[in-house]
Structure formats: C-alpha cells, structure tokens
Amino acid sequence: MEVTLERNLGDKPLRIQTGKLAKQASGSVVVSYGETITLVTVVGSQELRPGIDFVPLSVEYQEKVYAAGRIPGNYFRREIGRPSEKETLTARLIDRPIRPLFPKTWRYETQVIATVLSMDQENDPDMLSMVGASAALCISDLPFFTPIACVRVGRIDGELVANPTISQQENCDLNIIVAGSRDGVVMVEGGGQFISEEEMLDAIYFGQESLEPLLEMQEELMEKAGVPKRSADPVEKDEYLAAKVAELADPEIKKALEINDKLERQDAIRDVKKTVMEGLGEEYEDRGKEVSEFIHDRTRVIMRAMVLDEGRRIGGRRFDEVRPITCEVGILPRTHGSALFTRGETQSLGILTLGSSGDEQRVETLYGDETRPFMLHYNFPPYSVREVKRISGPSRRDIGHGGLSTRAIKEVLPSKEDFDYTIRIVSEILESNGSSSMATVCSASLALMDGGVPITNPVSGIAMGLMAEGDKIVVLSDILGDEDHMGDMDFKVAGTKDGITSVQMDIKISSLTREIMEKALAQARVGRLHILEKMLTTISESREEMSPYAPKVFTIQIHPDKIRDIIGPGGKVIRAIQAETGTRVDVDDSGLVKVSAVNLEEGEAALQMIKDITAVPEVGAVYEGTVVKIMDFGAFVAILPGTEGLCHISQLDTKHVKKVSDVVKEGEKIKVKVLELTKDGKIRLSRKALLEEENGKSGPENGAPQRDKNRH
C-alpha cells in the first residue's frame, strides 16, 4: 500500500512516502524536503547470528553524484572505494540514536542504507536520512518501537532557525543537530562560535520542540503500516549460576574497583574469573563465556552502586574532579609544531604541519568540488589500549573523533588573509582511558601555539558522564573508559574561555531533563577552564616565530594573461622553477602566485624567476638579452623569457653596419635598450643608443636611425 504523509518543517513541507520504492526491503521510505530526496531502506536477516553478544546493526549512507546532476570525476566515472568523510560522519549520525533502541538481545544482522537520490544544493540530505532511518524501522517487522526524529538548528542574527538551508548555514554562529523521541533529547552534535551554556541549552530544546511534526508522521505511518513485529529471542539465564557467580565474584570485584591504575584493574577483573571458575568446580568448566558475561554484569552493578549509593568513583576521585594533567610542547624537533597532552591515563601527541595552498585537501561533494585549508586527523593505534589488531586505514570512530575535534579548533584559526598556510594536525593517541577526542583538542591547541599559528584563543575539552537510577542522579567530570561504558551518557564539550565551539552528546537512557543537561554543561565549563589553566602554564600564547623548518610563503600578483607563461607547455616551466629552486609554486585563476619555500633564499630565487618570466618590457629600460636569430635587416634578441624584440641593423652600432653578422652572432649576449612598443605588440630595440650614451652622445629623438653622411 502506497502512503504519503506531509508536515511543515521550517518554511517548507517535508514528505515521507512508503510503498512505492524498494518494496522487498523489510522497510523503506522516501523522504523529500524541497528537491532533496533520500531513499532509506532497512533489512533484517531471517537467520540468527550465533556466538555474539551485541546488536549486529550496520548503517550505510551513500551520496550518489548523479543526485546533483554530475558525473564522478575519477577515472572509472562511478562511485567507488571507501565512503567519503561526509558519508562516514552522516552514517554515524544515523546510527547513534537508533542503536540503543533495539532490544539488547537482538542477534539478527540488520542493515540500514540511506541513498541520496536528488540534491537541490539548499537542503542537506543528512537530516532527511536520519528521519528516514527511524521511519523505515518503524514500519518494518523489526522490533523497533520508538520513533526518533532529527532537526538541524541554526542561529542567524540571534534568531534560532529549524533546518537552515546550506546557504543560510554559512551565516550561522551556531549549528547543531538534535535527535530525540517523545521522551526527550537522545543525541546532540554540532558546534558554534563561542556559545554560552545557556544559549546551547536553548538551541537544544528549540530543536526538541521542532521534532513534534516528524514524530507525528512516523506514528501515523506505523499505524497505517500495521506490520506485525518480530520479537528478539529471549536469552535464557541460568539464575543459579548467576547467583553463584555473584556470591564468588562480588567481593573481588569491589577490591578491583578500588584500583586506580587501569591495567592493574583490568588484570584484577580478569583474575576474578579465575577465582570464580575455581570456586565453581569442574562442573562449570565449559561455561566460561556465560561466567564472563555474569562477571561483566556484576561489575556494572557494583560500579554504579559505588557512585550512586556510596558517592565514590573508581580510584576515589570526586564527581567533579579532573585527573592530573601534564603538558609539553616542542618535543619533536623537525616538525612545525608539537605537543604532548596527558590527562590521567589518556595521552595525545599533537603534531602540526604547515603547507602551501597547493596542499589543501580537494574534495568532491554533492555541492561541488571544494578545498579545505585545515585538516585534523585522529589516529587510535591498538597499543594505546594494550590490544593487538591489524593496522588499516582510519576507522569510522577515528573519522568521527577527528570531525568533533575539527569543529572545536577551526573557530580559533586565523583567516587566510592573516595566515596564508594550509594547516594539518595529527593526533596520535598513545594511551587511552576515556575522552581521547577531548585530549586531541587540547594537544592540537598546544601544537598550534608551539608552531606559531596565531590562534585567537586556546581550546580545551572535557567528557562528561552520567549515572541515573530513579531519583539518584550523578554527573561525572572527565569520565574514564569504564565510566563511559557502564554509564548513561557521554557528553563531550570543547571551547575557549569565551564559549563552546563543539559538542557531542549520546545517552543510553530514554531522555534527559533540562536540569540535568544544565548541570552537566555548568560542570563541564568548570572542568574545561581548569584544563585550560593547566595548558596555559605550559605555553600562554602562540610563539612569535614559526619553526625554522616550516615553509615560507611568498606571493606575487601577475596579469592573468601571463599564467600560461609560468605554467609552460604541459607544465614544463613551472616544474623547472620548482626543480631549480626546491620550492612549490601554485597559481590561481586570478594570477595570484604563491611560492612555498623552506628558506628565504630559495623563495626569493623562485620569485625572481617568476618576475623575469612575467615581466613586461618598458620603454627606456635596458636589458641584457641573447641574440636568437640573425636576419639581413637586423637581429632578434630575447630580452625576457618568451619575449623577443628586433634590433634593426641601423641600431646595432654607432657606425654604419653593412652586415649584421659583422657585429653580433647568434647566442651572443648583448645589452639593448627598448625604444618602442608598437601597437601590434612588436618591440624595437637599440644597441646603438647605449653605445652613444657611453660615449656621452645623444642619439636622435626616439632613437630614429641617422642618415649616412656619405650617402647622396
């Protein structure tokens, strides 16, 4: 049955249609807003996946280039290879609010695919894909019962706007995505230009209020679809074994949770299993996996009870206490800037590299090709958490953490007019026990200052947690990995002393009240400023001088008509300049030439070559040129690269010249003076004028040839 529903969102209608496309999927919807259209499908396998202890959900987001009326620019002219950064980040946005809503015992492979079919350059398909994913799940036979809606919130000239267009987003000083259900907000992602905590709260709850029509549509769709829902296979629990494990494990778990050191604590928890297995005897020696699951469950219960009932955290920290912090800068001598930020057992090494405009990242998107002068890359090697894994390209998590940190830092970067460099920061996570993305923000900020990049303000970040059961609610600052894993919220906040630049929030409970979120943001501000103070004791402002190994950038403006002279046939000339001087030369369509060099001498040498190539002859100027061709009537002399003029036979010498070759030879270097630039582009030269000047004589006006007195 074909069903189409429509509600106004912002200044235009949003439509959800089902029953027309992809009807063999478990659920499929087409979401339209303006002329942007996405197809979202969901399929749940009919076969149980045994031997796993997690929900096997995968989410894919695909931006088809045809949606924007374009052909892919790669060799194959089709979409190939890994998803783009935008596709990866959007897939994570879709995944995060829906994953917690599946039954914890769901063990059937489930795949959500969002495909952008049409893009109008004004309405971003990411929000449509998030709404579509929830709608497709709601009308499917999968056990997904809670509609989730999503809206982008922007602020333009102080006014909050729901779903600003792409062009409007350029004028927003706040830009966040809010996802929520009937119960409340479940996810927040975005940032802004130094936003206060109260302003951020207002934006989040403005977004929550804007979700109402989208939730109504999905509820109506569910009712009209009327598809019976499958149930998750219940996991049979051996209550006797669970009780026995609790009896044997609880005392040892409590002791382990008193250990502050992460690795020692993990080893102690691992030893708990050995103790329990010995206590259970041979009868249960083949039930090790179940025992491990029961121990994990008891660890969660005991740790949460420590916090909620006893008011204690792992290692004895206060709820609002930040772990010890150390900062170092300039630790890598050949890089352009470096910093080591350590907070407890989380450590990030930030490395700054500066480049020319030619080093900017070029990205093909549905909006067209764009360049990015700032990049921040996050790496999480397995040794950082004492694991052994295959090293491959960046994971979705790596890309997501990099995106979060990028938002935090980019607001404090100087403009291209003030600092004409491409900036790349790499964060190497050397060890991790919670909040490595916020450690990345701190190390990146320190590395920028160490490298002499004139940022407006340093940025720090903190991860907040939550544990809530009934009326018992505790907000935790600077959470550990265990507190994140066994807690109810992961709320990352980054910013300067003047306000927030980046936020990311995910919760595992049904919703948060405004009061809890307000407390979390206020507590986060105190923690952020504490971390910032520690950073500033190491380096208080950007260095006045950049690293001697950083490139020097020189610029020169040339006439656009001269661009082809610098490039040369097939790039021959520009490659020769770069090879001879050891520099990098970039030219844009306006004729702005940028030379990137390691030292001053190389840069000036390249600039001089460019000036010589693009120089325009001036009347009265003297040039040392090379005779390139001899004719009966004179000699052609190359006075500049690609520029030749004629020195007439009468202008070769002060005395009468019978034969040109008697005075000059091909390949000979001679000095000549420019007499005239004719309207048809020809250049008249004179050697004779210079000889007369050397002899103290003045030739005829304008260098006109003299009549031979012996001729009648």
UniProtKB/Swiss-Prot annotation:
PROSITE patterns: KH_TYPE_1, S1. Its main location: cytoplasm. Residues 551-610 form the KH domain. InterPro entries: ExoRNase_PH_dom1, ExoRNase_PH_dom2, ExoRNase_PH_dom2_sf, KH_dom, KH_dom_type_1, KH_dom_type_1_sf, NA-bd_OB-fold, PNPase. It holds the Pfam family RNase_PH_C. GO terms for biological process: mRNA catabolic process; RNA processing. HAMAP family: PNPase. PANTHER family: POLYRIBONUCLEOTIDE NUCLEOTIDYLTRANSFERASE, POLYRIBONUCLEOTIDE NUCLEOTIDYLTRANSFERASE 1, MITOCHONDRIAL. Involved in mRNA degradation. Catalyzes the phosphorolysis of single-stranded polyribonucleotides processively in the 3'- to 5'-direction. This is Polyribonucleotide nucleotidyltransferase. The gene is pnp.
